[in-house]
């Protein structure tokens, strides 16, 4: 009996109602799909169409092999039960990944389809686990964990959690779960198990590479690359919750200019609008936004405005959007997805009609005034109740397609801006999924707490996001929640975080600083309040001197930072990199979670423990390392104790590169 066949460039297996297809998908890469009682779909949630490949396919009676460059898949019928097992190898014949066997009398299934109402399935895909394997990427989870081996991760978005189902393995491969369904992944010591709570087919992509950088380049080619970061993305961004009127925005920008402190972007936060979903300035608080934006441009400052996907039932656009089916639907109950200053539904970013409609509003009320960059907040979106099974998008149920929402939100603005004649595009966004990078998504890590614990988590998050194919990433410097401006301990945390932020892809000061002041309109109605001052001069002279010094350092690095953005644009390389990204042959580098590389040349060791004035730093083997503070040179492959009084940050120059920084930090 013939189980295997070649169909064009793909290897096909059929048995017992299941169809499995393995196809070449880019250099050294394969895409595997499987369906039960259904035809395979060519639709891909994340992958772009690949360049033409010439695979080698070998067909046998009970085994077949497909080879594409450095990777080959072996499809074997097991002797017990006629279950198919798929194994992936590199060009050296080393096993990369293998489905679980059927276990003989256990009758296990590596690809398990459990029927749901309609034509969907609850899908489980199980692979054998190599105990020595280390796993990195998967997006952004709020945990102080670098090696994800042993972790259970929810494949769903929440405020400060961005699920991007791609990982880089220490065994020399990258794996993308090409499925936008809500689910879970368990990187166990015995098996790795992926679940999708509702889907039509199994779909994943795997690539082999000799280095993490090679794997990352393959992933960028498969899912897209970031645009080139505009020049105003390279410097310092000022933000707070919230500048609530026009004069306040202008006074802050004027003060930066007066003090001769470089400022690239100032951000106007939420509720500058009358109601969510109006997507325009409230004329009472912003009477002449065009004049405001013009003056900011004359000061050399870009204006960024906050956008929310929420549409208040009182919004001037709500009834039309409801009538035109441009809002997210609830499967049961009322269509209220967020309760915040009233009842709100979310605009459906997966609907092309919605994307066109919302962009036209934002073009008319923002872009036509001169605004070129947007802050796409609440991008998960942030349901008041995360009952994923109760919501439905144009693209399908949230259980089946929900994770694409933040990418389509980014797409809405990117495509609108491109049509409007804008080339280099960056929009700040609170979440992402596979492919978001190609739509100019600069992800920040969400509404995190102002604590050292959360600070440490962000270092891991930044490393993982870079390895997940998102080179543009940042945080709220100082954290978002519960930072009391007058508290000396918070000031210390802010300074240490500010130093870290200098060496992030984008340097942005933000937070909801306490105490909080209520704001009322002329009619006496309560509006969204404002936190206390959050500018670099707001925290006393010592903090001011340190923070302005580090803004100066950021400016000194502008050419270098621009070159890193060029690498991200052309090759998909992260800006913030794990040590092992540049030094994969040094085994210690695979475990360092509290230091990182800013590009290839700068090793950054944040001070992320309260009252610490020194720390241990590992310097990777294979290079010499110059202390940017003192000029002292160390050989790699050793641990050192780096002193770090409050006004300095341990930064080391690889082989003496970027030596203009010596004595500046």
Residue ranges and their predicted role:
Residues 22, 70, 166, 256, ...:
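Conserved, mostly hydrophobic/aromatic
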Residues 227-391, 437:
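Aromatic-lined carbohydrate-binding/catalytic grooves of carbohydrate-active enzymes
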Residues 204-208, 233-246, 273-287, 339-359, ...:
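The substrate-binding groove and active-site-proximal loops of carbohydrate-active enzymes
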Residues 414-416, 420-425, 432-444, 465-475, ...:
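Catalytic core of carbohydrate-active enzymes
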Residues 1-233, 239-241, 246-254, 265, ...:
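N-terminal accessory segment at the very beginning of proteins
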Residues 74-75, 270-273, 280, 284-339, ...:
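Active-site-proximal helices and loops of the catalytic beta/alpha 8
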Residues 29, 72, 165-166, 172-175, ...:
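Beta-sheet entry/capping signal
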Residues 37, 171-173, 180-182, 211, ...:
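Short, glycine-/Ser/Thr-/acidic-enriched flexible segments
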């Amino acid at each position: 009996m013939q189980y295997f066949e070649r169909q064009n460039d793909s290897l096909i297996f059929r048995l017992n109602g299941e169809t499995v297809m393995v196809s070449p998908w880019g250099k050294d890469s394969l895409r595997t799909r499987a369906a039960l009682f259904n035809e395979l779909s060519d639709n891909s949630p994340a992958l772009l169409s690949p360049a033409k490949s010439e695979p080698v396919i070998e067909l046998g009676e009970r085994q077949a092999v497909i080879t594409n460059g450095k990777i080959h898949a072996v499809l074997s019928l097991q002797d017990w039960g006629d279950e198919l097992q798929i194994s992936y190898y590199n060009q050296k014949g080393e096993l990369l990944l293998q489905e679980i066997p059927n276990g003989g009398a256990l009758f296990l299934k590596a690809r398990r389809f459990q029927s749901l109402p309609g034509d969907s399935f609850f899908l489980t895909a199980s692979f054998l686990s190599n105990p020595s394997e280390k796993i990195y990427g998967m997006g952004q989870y709020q945990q102080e964990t670098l090696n994800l081996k042993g972790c259970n991760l929810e494949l769903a978005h929440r405020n400060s959690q961005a699920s991007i189902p791609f990982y880089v393995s220490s065994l020399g491969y990258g794996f993308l779960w090409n499925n936008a369904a809500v689910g879970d992944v368990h990187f166990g010591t015995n098996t790795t198990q992926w679940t999708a709570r509702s889907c039509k087919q199994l779909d994943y992509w795997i690539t082999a590479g000799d280095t993490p950088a090679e794997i990352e380049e393959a992933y960028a080619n498969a899912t897209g690359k970031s645009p080139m970061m505009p020049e105003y993305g390279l410097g310092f961004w000022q933000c707070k919750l919230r500048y609530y009127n026009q004069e306040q925005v202008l006074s802050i920008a004027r003060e930066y200019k007066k003090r001769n402190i470089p400022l690239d972007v100032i951000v106007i936060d939420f509720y500058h609008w009358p109601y969510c979903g109006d997507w325009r300035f409230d004329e009472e608080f912003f009477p002449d936004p065009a004049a405001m934006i013009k003056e900011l441009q004359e000061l050399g400052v870009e204006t960024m405005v906050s956008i929310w996907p929420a549409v208040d039932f009182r919004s001037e656009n709500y009834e039309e959007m409801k009538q035109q089916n441009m809002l997210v639907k609830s499967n049961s109950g009322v269509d209220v997805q967020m309760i915040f200053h009233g009842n709100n539904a979310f605009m459906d970013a997966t609907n092309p009609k919605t994307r066109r409609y919302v962009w036209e509003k934002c073009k008319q009320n923002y872009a036509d005034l001169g605004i070129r960059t947007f802050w796409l907040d609440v991008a998960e979106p942030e349901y008041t109740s995360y009952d994923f099974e109760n919501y439905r998008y144009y693209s399908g149920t949230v259980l089946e397609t929900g994770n694409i929402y933040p990418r389509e939100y980014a797409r809405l603005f990117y495509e609108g801006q491109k049509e409007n004649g804008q080339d280099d595009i960056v929009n700040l966004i609170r979440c992402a999924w596979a492919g978001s990078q190609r739509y100019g998504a600069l992800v920040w890590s969400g509404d995190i707490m102002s604590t050292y614990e959360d600070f440490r988590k962000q270092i891991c998050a930044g490393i993982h996001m870079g390895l997940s194919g998102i080179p543009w990433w940042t945080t709220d410097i100082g954290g978002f929640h519960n930072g009391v401006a007058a508290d000396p301990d918070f000031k210390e945390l802010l300074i240490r975080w500010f130093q870290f932020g200098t060496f992030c892809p984008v340097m942005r000061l933000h937070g909801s600083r306490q105490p909080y002041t209520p704001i009322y309109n002329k009619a006496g109605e309560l509006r969204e309040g404002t936190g206390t001052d959050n500018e670099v001069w707001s925290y006393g002279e010592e903090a001011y001197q340190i923070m302005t010094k580090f803004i100066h350092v950021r400016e000194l690095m502008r050419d270098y930072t621009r070159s890193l953005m060029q690498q991200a644009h052309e090759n998909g390389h992260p800006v913030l990199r794990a040590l092992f990204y540049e030094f994969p042959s040094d085994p210690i580098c695979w475990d360092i979670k509290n230091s990182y590389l800013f590009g290839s040349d700068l090793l950054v060791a944040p001070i992320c423990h309260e009252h610490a004035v020194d720390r241990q730093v590992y310097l990777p083997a294979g290079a010499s390392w110059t202390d940017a503070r003192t000029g002292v040179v160390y050989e790699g492959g050793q641990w050192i104790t780096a002193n770090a009084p409050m006004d300095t940050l341990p930064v080391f120059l690889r082989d003496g590169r970027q030596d203009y920084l010596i004595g500046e930090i």
